[in-house]
């Protein structure tokens, strides 16, 4: 009878009883220590990722342009290799 009386007075489900009636906002979601006393890791939000490439036409032409390619022997080899392969665009 004690089990029946306890179930009538307390929470109706076992999971709600384990959470102590705080089923709306568990402590783990709020960043408070969990059942073992360890703080839960927070997700790092607001950290910008994937924005490493910021295109600049000036830098692109200076590094890979026609004048820069022909100014060095290795650049001439690049142009000749692309001509041999049949590339439509030889440089930027």
From Swiss-Prot:
It comes from Homo sapiens. Component of the mitochondrial large ribosomal subunit (mt-LSU). Mature mammalian 55S mitochondrial ribosomes consist of a small (28S) and a large (39S) subunit. The 28S small subunit contains a 12S ribosomal RNA (12S mt-rRNA) and 30 different proteins. The 39S large subunit contains a 16S rRNA (16S mt-rRNA), a copy of mitochondrial valine transfer RNA (mt-tRNA(Val)), which plays an integral structural role, and 52 different proteins. The modification Phosphoserine is found at residue 71. Keywords: Mitochondrion, Phosphoprotein, Ribonucleoprotein, Ribosomal protein, Transit peptide. NCBIfam families: rpmH_bact. GO terms for cellular component: mitochondrial inner membrane; mitochondrial large ribosomal subunit; mitochondrial ribosome; mitochondrion. Residues 1-46 form a transit peptide. Its main location: mitochondrion. Belongs to the bacterial ribosomal protein bL34 family. GO terms for biological process: mitochondrial translation; translation. It is found in: Mitochondrion. One of its GO terms (molecular function) is structural constituent of ribosome. This is Large ribosomal subunit protein bL34m. The keyword Iron does not apply. It comes from the Eukaryota. Coiled coil: none annotated. Pfam families: Ribosomal_L34 (PF00468).
């Amino acid at each position: 009878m004690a089990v029946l009386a306890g179930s009538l007075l307390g929470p109706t489900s076992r999971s709600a009883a384990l959470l102590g009636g705080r089923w709306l906002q568990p402590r783990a979601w709020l960043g408070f220590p969990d059942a073992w006393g360890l703080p839960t890791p927070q997700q790092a939000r607001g950290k910008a990722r994937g924005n490493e490439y910021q295109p600049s036409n000036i830098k692109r032409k200076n590094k890979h342009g026609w004048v820069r390619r022909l100014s060095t022997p290795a650049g001439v080899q690049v142009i000749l290799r692309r001509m041999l392969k049949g590339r439509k665009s030889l440089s930027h």
